[in-house]
Amino acid sequence: MARKIKIFDTTLRDGEQTPGVSLTVEEKIEIAKQLARLNVDVIEAGFPISSPGEFEAVKRIAREVRGPTIAALARAVKKDIDAAGEALKDAESKRIHTFIATSLIHMKYKLRKTPEEVKKMAVEAVEYATKYTDDIEFSAEDATRSDWNFLVEVYEAVIDAGATTINVPDTVGYTTPEEFYELIRYLKRNITNLNGVTISVHCHNDLGLAVANSLSAVRAGADQVEVTVNGIGERAGNAALEEVVVALDVRKDFYNVETGINLGEIARTSKLVARLTGIEVPPNKAVVGANAFAHESGIHQDGVLKERTTYEIIDPRKLGFSGSKIVLGKHSGRHAFRKKLEEMGYRLSEEEINRLFAKFKEIADRKKGLTELDIEAIVQEELGKGKGKYSVEVLHVISGKISTATVRVQGDGIDKIESAWSSNGPIDALFAAINRALGIDCKLKEYRVSSVTSGRDALGEVLVRVEYNGEIYVGRGLSTDIIEASAQAYLSALNRIRR
């Protein structure tokens, strides 16, 4: 039978300590209600003594949010514990979380107290907290830089005083998975009164190991993991909730544990926290980043389209996302391109697909990530222009008071003729050079440029109307380069002329 791992979410307390983040009371309540839908076991709602606003937020969450246990943080000081107890009084299920540092560096320089004085303060704090609740968590701040024997002493003393959860924080993100595993095992072997007491871990990400350390602790026997949504928090952040719970779910065969988290709410929770905190999720962020289930490599796309599990270890729909994302770019293959065209409703011949794929590859080399609008524009432009009698290559265009364009034209009996022309503007020079190469006298009646897609590397569409022998001919061109699009449009119009 799988062992239950409690998920203690501290997004509203440690997460809000992210530099630049400040949530209103209403925003905290909104996040707390979403965390309840996610089905976390404990919500650490805040640090009530720190400000009137923080006290009010904890009080409102305690009153309005049902399901999870609501926790409030307090130093090992009576006034902090009183504030926490008062803020939590309306909670359906409440916990006071008190802490004091136990490492030599903290005791000497921050607290200026001896180990015995620190242990006494810890015990008195836990005893005092029992007047408000019988669910008390004690944290030995900076545990991973503390003497292991002293940790055992302190934890045994606070358990005797009434602590029901002992937390082992890696406060400065100092430990490694192997060392943390050994520490948790050591505590489990040496704390003599641990029966029925929850061992919790709280990992910071200063060395990028918060999730790995948390998972290592679970394997060593920890019962509770403290996390934040999107991994936000002090400095480099905390262990990310979504990464920890998804790892435990995907590797249930290895860890043999379950969290009870409603995985279908992961995406919604991540987006809500990102929006309200203003901390964007990096695109390459595990589990919830925009690229977490995106595939651009042709080999990967081909595999995913044939069988999703070839390159995905979890179905994104299980986490509340719409599905995998095939990103069309310069690494994409013909299979993914064909699939995208079919999804867009196009049923094309092999010859048409080959033409479109060649154009797609040409544009993809210059544009990062083609959108559906880009693909639509390529289809309309390529299939609308026909094969054409002539093709043009723009060799170079020099702009200035006098602009010069040099082109190479071939086709319909013309073998790569180069032509140059100077004029008042680059487009005039370009069209005149093409006319000269083809020996044709056309008059430009209309020239129009529009952006087909968005972004700095957007596709631009050029429309031209030219007059030849009293008839009007229309041409269109599409490219990330307006000069090139203009040349394509002009040739498109000339290819319609019957001579």
UniProtKB/Swiss-Prot annotation:
Its main location: cytoplasm. Pathway: Amino-acid biosynthesis; L-leucine biosynthesis; L-leucine from 3-methyl-2-oxobutanoate: step 1/4. PROSITE patterns: AIPM_HOMOCIT_SYNTH_1, AIPM_HOMOCIT_SYNTH_2, PYR_CT. Residues 391-499 are annotated as: Regulatory domain. One of its GO terms (cellular component) is cytoplasm. Its EC number is 2.3.3.13. SUPFAM superfamilies: 2-isopropylmalate synthase LeuA, allosteric (dimerisation) domain, Aldolase. Catalyzes the condensation of the acetyl group of acetyl-CoA with 3-methyl-2-oxobutanoate (2-ketoisovalerate) to form 3-carboxy-3-hydroxy-4-methylpentanoate (2-isopropylmalate). HAMAP family: LeuA_type1. This is 2-isopropylmalate synthase. It comes from Pyrococcus furiosus (strain ATCC 43587 / DSM 3638 / JCM 8422 / Vc1). The lineage of its organism: Archaea, Methanobacteriati, Methanobacteriota, Thermococci, Thermococcales. The gene is leuA.
